[in-house]
Every structure is written in C-alpha cells, then in structure tokens.
Amino acid sequence: MPRRKVVAKREILPDPKFGSERLAKFMNHLMVSGKKSVAERIVYGALDKVAERSKDEPLEIFDKALETIQPMVEVKSRRVGGATYQVPVEVRPSRRQALAMRWLVDAARSRGEKTMVQRLAGEMLDAAEGKGAAVKKREDVHRMADANKAFSHYRF
C-alpha cells in the first residue's frame, strides 16, 4: 500500500458553448502542446459540420458516438508461472470514457480528409452510425477478450 495521500481529482470546467463537461474532457484529449484554443476551434468546427450533415443535435451525435465506441471488456496481461496470459477484465466507467475519447481522436487523425475539422466530423458521424475506425478498434478489443475467455479465472 502506498504511504502517500490520494491525489484529489481535478474538477473539469464545462465547455463555454454547450456547457458539457464531457465535451471539455474531449477537447483536453484532442489538445496538443497545451493549445486549448486550437482544440476548441477544431471541436466546435466539427460539431458545426455534424449539424450541417445531420438533422440531429450535434451534441447528441457526439454522445452517441462515444457510447458506441466505449469498450465493455478489455484484456490485461497476467504472468502465471512462465507464461503470460491475456486475461479479459471489465472496464471501469471512467476508463471506458477515456478510451472512447482516445480512440475517436486517433481514428480522426488517421482519416484522409484535408482538415482535422472534417476528419473529426466524419469520424463522429461514422461512430454514431456504428461504423468507422474507432468502432473497429472497439470490436477488435471485444474480439480479443472473447477469444481469451478461457483465462478469465485468472482474476486481478
């Protein structure tokens, strides 16, 4: 057991336009080198593009995309004897959200569109519909956990 004090979680202020803490957290994931204004411009631009392309509310589509991407189970390596097993474990809610945001940003960065605004908007729309690279990543993680179900008795 560590002897240090438990560090208090920092409070994340909601974003100025929509008042959503989840969106503010996503901006922090997207931000590079502390450039928050650039991250805000990209996210708000992407949400505007989503609003143009879809009849639904852009924040609803963002939330739906994150819900679709969130993994329920993942695999963790556990060493037993001389062998390393990939043990499926349930993902706690805070990590679920963090992974979904990370995967959405990574998938958007790897897309082929010209600007990051277009890439992010496209990936959000795809994820909300249940397709795209971020959803594929989730399916791969779930498939890996399913394949290693036999080792689930090696709990953490």
Curated annotation (Swiss-Prot):
One of its GO terms (cellular component) is small ribosomal subunit. InterPro entries: Ribosomal_uS7, Ribosomal_uS7_bac/org-type, Ribosomal_uS7_dom, Ribosomal_uS7_dom_sf. The keyword Cell membrane does not apply. Keywords: Ribonucleoprotein, Ribosomal protein, RNA-binding, rRNA-binding, tRNA-binding. GO terms for biological process: translation. It holds the Pfam family Ribosomal_S7. The keyword tRNA-binding applies. GO terms for molecular function: rRNA binding; structural constituent of ribosome; tRNA binding. Gene3D superfamilies: Ribosomal protein S7 domain. SUPFAM superfamilies: Ribosomal protein S7. Belongs to the universal ribosomal protein uS7 family. Part of the 30S ribosomal subunit. Contacts proteins S9 and S11. One of the primary rRNA binding proteins, it binds directly to 16S rRNA where it nucleates assembly of the head domain of the 30S subunit. Is located at the subunit interface close to the decoding center, probably blocks exit of the E-site tRNA. PANTHER family: RIBOSOMAL PROTEIN S7. HAMAP family: Ribosomal_uS7_B. This is Small ribosomal subunit protein uS7. It comes from Chromohalobacter salexigens (strain ATCC BAA-138 / DSM 3043 / CIP 106854 / NCIMB 13768 / 1H11).
